[in-house]
Swiss-Prot record:
Lineage: Eukaryota, Fungi, Dikarya, Ascomycota, Pezizomycotina
Full protein name: Monooxygenase ptaG
Organism, scientific name: Pestalotiopsis fici (strain W106-1 / CGMCC3.15140)
EC number per UniProt: 1.-.-.-
Gene: ptaG
Coiled-coil stretches noted in the UniProt entry, renumbered to this chain: none
Recorded metabolic or biological pathway in which this protein acts: Secondary metabolite biosynthesis
Length: 144
């Protein structure tokens, strides 16, 4: 169990490093081939997204976040259940004038070896999400 725990911790640190650097490639480097991601709460109605979608969406999102900062407030790591939870706040400027200020928790699941992330469920600030993403979608459609 100790070696699996060490592998999970190393994987988690790599994932968080990519997150802090707003670097999707770095984050997804530790994602398994069958990786999935889902935005929570369920009431938002978002489907589970496969890795292939995250590989397109994350770089696009990070590309518009200027002066990005991520502050981690809490990390809980449960080796036995192959999970970690991260509570964080990120902030950034955007080219369309809507400030990015997202308070959220990420629930991360590791594979059996602990060297890959197989799933991330991200509980977002719904008030922010419901205001930001229509503005973001409008920006994307105007800047194709």
């Amino acid at each position: 169990m100790a070696s699996t725990g060490s592998a999970q911790k190393e994987t988690l640190n790599k994932f968080i490093s990519g997150w802090k650097n707003a670097n999707a490639e770095e984050m997804l480097a530790v994602a398994s081939d069958d990786y999935t991601q889902q935005t929570l709460p369920f009431s938002l109605g978002h489907d589970v997204r496969p890795k292939q979608v995250a590989e397109v969406m994350l770089p696009k999102l990070y590309s518009i976040l200027e002066n990005y900062e991520l502050k981690i407030h809490q990390v809980v790591h449960d080796v036995e259940n192959q999970k970690a939870a991260v509570y964080a706040i990120s902030k950034a400027d955007t080219p369309f004038g809507f400030p990015w200020l997202n308070e959220f928790s990420a629930f991360i699941t590791f594979n059996n070896a602990g060297d890959k992330v197989v799933n991330v469920q991200e509980m977002v600030d719904t008030e922010f999400f419901q205001k930001f993403f229509p503005a973001y979608q409008s920006f994307l459609s105007q800047n194709k």
